[in-house]
Structure formats: structure tokens, C-alpha cells
Amino acid sequence: MSDTLLDLDFETTAQNPNSNEILPLGTEALIIYNSPSGEKRSTKNQTKENTKNDTGSLFDDLGIKDHTANQQTNENSKPLSDSEILKKFSSPPHPK
């Protein structure tokens, strides 16, 4: 296989050498991902500290909020009985 460059037509030109869309052909393909955060994080020689606000969610870097972590339960709430569950989730009675 030849070691030529292939333009995948992602608005790249030969005048734009900084574009990442021109990939070399060969036994390995070069794939580059530019993070939207714009900053590189160095995880080398760092220890992770558990904090109250650190959820460790996979979606933190994507800006997706985890709504399940924000749910607060009432300390005085009791579990619903079977009849209360049926009343709460059953259809309303039909008019006669």
C-alpha cells in the first residue's frame, strides 16, 4: 500500500496544514480528536481525591447533567403501601 495522503473532503485544503482531516494511508491510520474543552488535562502523577461534588460520571466532560444525583428524599417519607401504590398509579375511575 502506498504512503500517500487522502483528502476526505472535510473542508481541508493543501494550504491548511493544521487540519486534522487529512489522514495518512498505510498500515496505521492517524485519528485525532480535538477536545471541545480546549485544555489538556495531565493525569500523570495525580491521585484522585473523592470530594462531595465529584460524581465521577462519564458524562461530566460532555456537559450532560446527571439528574439522579440531585434527587433528595424527604427524611420523614415512608414507603408506600400496596394500596397507596395502586391508588397513585391506577387510572382514574370512569364516570357512571
Curated annotation (Swiss-Prot):
Residues 35-96 are annotated as: Disordered. Residues 38-52 have a biased composition (Basic and acidic residues). Residues 69-80 have a biased composition (Polar residues). This is Uncharacterized protein DDB_G0293048. It comes from Dictyostelium discoideum.
